[in-house]
Curated annotation (Swiss-Prot):
Keywords noted in UniProt: Ribonucleoprotein, Ribosomal protein
Organism encoding this protein: Staphylothermus marinus (strain ATCC 43588 / DSM 3639 / JCM 9404 / F1)
Any one cellular-component term (Gene Ontology): ribosome
Gene3D superfamilies attached to this UniProt entry: 4.10.1060.50
Encoding gene, per UniProt annotation: rpl40e
Any one Gene Ontology molecular-function term assigned to this protein's record: structural constituent of ribosome
GO terms of biological process kind: translation
Family to which this protein belongs: Belongs to the eukaryotic ribosomal protein eL40 family.
Name of the featured protein: Large ribosomal subunit protein eL40
Keyword Ribosomal protein: yes
């Protein structure tokens, strides 16, 4: 069942999708990270997910 409430959608985005993923080891990092917490690589990307309208 899709979530249509904009407030709940924002909560889901911040809780689930607002992260960075290390391209080297796959670890999840906070959105403000500049280096990976596990392998110290600087090769991070934002987590893929849906786009907010």
């Amino acid at each position: 069942m899709p979530i249509t409430d904009p407030v709940k959608l924002q909560i889901v985005y911040n809780r689930v999708l607002n992260k960075k993923v290390c391209r080297k080891c796959g670890a999840l990092n906070p959105p403000t990270a500049t280096k990976c917490r596990r392998c110290k690589s600087k090769n991070l990307r934002p987590k893929k997910g849906f786009k907010l309208k």
